[in-house]
């Protein structure tokens, strides 16, 4: 499992001109799932992201988690994170999980994040989405389970 995490001042996702998810501040997650991922990977990433200290304390040091600052999470499914661009001019997405498996594991992942005590908003799995955010910092990290 691969997640691009962005600390966000605000974020939203729109499908067919309608906002389907938005947060006032917290983390925007682009979530990629490969065919080898399991519920164990999803739980690991959910716990890691929820407790990662990437928000500043009073001294400006990254010392607080999204839980500590009472932030929220906007989670977006993103199969293109497993695009392989090493050969040719078109990405190969063979490492991305099949949609039915990926959707089940993506839903499980979001529930695991909620179990950590976070409010989670999502996009629409498999849809074309417009994602808007103000990246805070900017702080952008890649978190992987393997």
Swiss-Prot record:
Broad class of where this protein is predominantly found: cytoplasm
Entry note about domains: A Gly-cisPro motif from one monomer fits into the active site of the other monomer to allow specific chiral rejection of L-amino acids.
Subunit description: Homodimer.
Swiss-Prot/TrEMBL keywords: Cytoplasm, Hydrolase, RNA-binding, tRNA-binding
Function in brief: An aminoacyl-tRNA editing enzyme that deacylates mischarged D-aminoacyl-tRNAs. Also deacylates mischarged glycyl-tRNA(Ala), protecting cells against glycine mischarging by AlaRS. Acts via tRNA-based rather than protein-based catalysis; rejects L-amino acids rather than detecting D-amino acids in the active site. By recycling D-aminoacyl-tRNA to D-amino acids and free tRNA molecules, this enzyme counteracts the toxicity associated with the formation of D-aminoacyl-tRNA entities in vivo and helps enforce protein L-homochirality.
Subcellular localization: Cytoplasm
Top EC class, one word: hydrolase
Native organism: Bacillus cereus (strain G9842)
Sequence motif Gly-cisPro motif, important for rejection of L-amino acids, location on chain: 137-138
Gene: dtd
Stated name of the protein: D-aminoacyl-tRNA deacylase
Xref: SUPFAM superfamilies: DTD-like (SSF69500)
NCBIfam families recorded: D-aminoacyl-tRNA deacylase (TIGR00256)
The reaction(s) this protein catalyses: glycyl-tRNA(Ala) + H2O = tRNA(Ala) + glycine + H(+); a D-aminoacyl-tRNA + H2O = a tRNA + a D-alpha-amino acid + H(+)
UniProt GO molecular function: D-tyrosyl-tRNA(Tyr) deacylase activity; Gly-tRNA(Ala) deacylase activity; Ser(Gly)-tRNA(Ala) hydrolase activity; tRNA binding
